[in-house]
Structure formats: structure tokens, C-alpha cells
Curated annotation (Swiss-Prot):
Phosphorolytic 3'-5' exoribonuclease that plays an important role in tRNA 3'-end maturation. Removes nucleotide residues following the 3'-CCA terminus of tRNAs; can also add nucleotides to the ends of RNA molecules by using nucleoside diphosphates as substrates, but this may not be physiologically important. Probably plays a role in initiation of 16S rRNA degradation (leading to ribosome degradation) during starvation. Sulfate ions in the crystal structure may represent the inorganic phosphate substrate. This is Ribonuclease PH. GO terms for molecular function: 3'-5'-RNA exonuclease activity; tRNA binding; tRNA nucleotidyltransferase activity. InterPro entries: ExoRNase_PH_dom1 (IPR001247), ExoRNase_PH_dom2 (IPR015847), ExoRNase_PH_dom2_sf (IPR036345), PNPase/RNase_PH_dom_sf (IPR027408), Ribosomal_Su5_D2-typ_SF (IPR020568), RNase_PH (IPR050080), RNase_PH_bac-type (IPR002381), RNase_PH_CS (IPR018336). Homohexameric ring arranged as a trimer of dimers. Belongs to the RNase PH family. One of its GO terms (biological process) is rRNA processing. It catalyses: tRNA(n+1) + phosphate = tRNA(n) + a ribonucleoside 5'-diphosphate. NCBIfam families: RNasePH.
């Protein structure tokens, strides 16, 4: 039994609150256990200079954490005047993952700005951001469809992400909280589509190694969790699902 009472391959309690903010075209508050992230999607009727004239859209992301999202207050990056390497890595990961399932030609010459703001962190903030951002983005696309600016919702598949790891005395576990993540021998983030295709796998041994058999076990656990997350996304999207499938 894990520190929070879960089974080894059991997700934390997940809830996705849709249309959480008033102004963005799409927004959610995603809760993954005690991790809470506000994800918003903004549609801009232009593309970056390097995309002009190509007849395709673009998806990009920004990620931030409020000072007391963590146990000890952290200084805002805006106060430092620069974005940390960790933040830059996560922003690129979110944007890259979402672009994998967006039909950029069907989107047209528009930019989707994804903003992920962590208001409470207890492990898995980047994977929660991806799972929530997908829903926020689809909500924004639904508004484009209603306004007859696109002929269909420009996504090719569902997308969700979770963490898996190897924790001493537990073995392979799914959806690590901070306490588990901080002592994990192996930590891995997995992003997959609804068809079971991998978008990205980030795995690291923390002063430890892992075998091919353990890798397979980690990926199996992640796949199981991601399919559950996609079911939760579908429930949150409601009738919009009929425009995707």
C-alpha cells in the first residue's frame, strides 16, 4: 500500500472543471490529487512569422507556478527577469505534445496559446498540464466550429499524460505524488494518444538503473493510466466528443 493508500497502479482522484475562467476561449481547472493546474487556450488570428503563408496553424505553450504552489514559497520567475531551464523544457514539452494531435492545416493560419498555471503542486505538474491543456484546447476549437471559422474540430486524436516510476519496496507505481517522486529510483513521464501511440517518453534512473522488463512494466502501467485519463477527458467534454470521434 502506498503512502496515500492507493494501489500500485491506481491513479489519484482526477477532476476536470471545464470553462473555469470567463475570458479564454477554452479553460479548465484540472485536479490530480493535490496537484491543481489552471489551463487556458487562447485563439489568435495569426501565426508566428516563420509560419506565414504556409496555410497552417501553430500551437505553443507557457507554463508557470504561483509562489506558494509549493510547500516553501518560490520567487516568481518574472522577478528574476528570466525563465528557468526547467520551465522552458516543460513549455516546449506541452506545445510539442499538443501539436502531435492537432490538424494544423485544418486549424488554418491561427495560433493557439496554451497557458498552464500551477496553483498547487504535489507531483506530476507537467503531465497534469498536458492532460488539462488538451481539454482546454478542444473547448476553444469548439468555439471556432460554432463560429464557422473551421469545418471541423482540428484534432486527430485524444492526448493525455501521466507519470510512472519505481519506488523502493513498492516496485512500479503509477501517477507519483511529490513524496513518491522525491524518493523514486526511476522516474518517467509518458504521453500517449487515444489510439495508444506514444508521443513522448521521458525516463531517468535516479542513481539507479532499470531493465528492459521493468521498462515494459512501466509503459504498461502508464498506458493503463492514460486510457483512464482519456475517459475522464471525454466525460468532461460531453457532447463535444461527437465532433472528435
Amino acid at each position: 500500500m502506498r503512502v496515500d493508500g492507493r494501489e500500485k497502479t491506481e491513479l489519484r482522484h482526477i477532476h476536470i472543471h471545464t470553462n473555469y475562467l470567463k475570458h479564454p476561449e477554452g479553460s479548465v481547472l484540472i485536479e490530480v490529487g493535490d496537484t491543481k493546474v489552471i489551463c487556458s487556450a487562447t485563439i489568435e488570428e495569426r501565426v508566428p512569422p516563420f509560419m506565414r503563408g504556409e496555410g497552417k496553424g501553430w500551437v505553443t505553450a507557457e507554463y508557470a507556478m504561483i509562489p506558494r504552489a509549493t510547500e516553501q514559497r518560490t520567487i516568481r520567475e518574472s522577478s528574476k527577469g528570466k525563465v528557468t531551464g526547467r520551465t522552458m523544457e516543460i513549455q516546449r514539452l506541452i506545445g510539442r505534445a499538443l501539436r502531435a494531435v492537432v490538424d494544423l492545416e485544418a486549424l488554418g493560419e491561427r495560433t493557439v496559446w496554451i497557458d498552464c498555471d500551477v496553483i498547487q503542486a504535489d507531483g506530476g505538474t507537467r503531465t497534469a498540464s498536458i492532460t488539462g491543456a488538451y481539454v482546454a484546447m478542444v473547448l476553444a476549437f469548439e468555439k471556432l466550429l460554432q463560429a464557422e471559422k473551421v469545418s471541423k474540430i482540428p484534432v486527430k486524436d485524444y492526448l493525455a499524460a501521466t507519470s510512472v516510476g519505481i519506488v523502493e519496496e513498492q516496485g512500479v507505481v503509477l501517477d507519483l505524488n511529490y513524496a513518491e517522486d522525491s524518493k523514486a529510483d526511476v522516474d518517467m513521464n509518458v504521453i500517449m494518444t487515444g489510439k495508444g501511440q506514444f508521443v513522448e517518453v521521458q525516463g531517468t534512473g535516479e542513481e539507479a538503473t532499470f531493465s528492459r522488463a521493468q521498462l515494459n512494466e512501466l509503459l504498461d502501467a502508464a498506458e493503463q493510466g492514460i486510457f483512464q485519463l482519456i475517459d475522464i477527458q471525454k466525460e468532461a467534454l460531453g457532447d463535444i466528443v461527437s465532433h472528435i470521434e
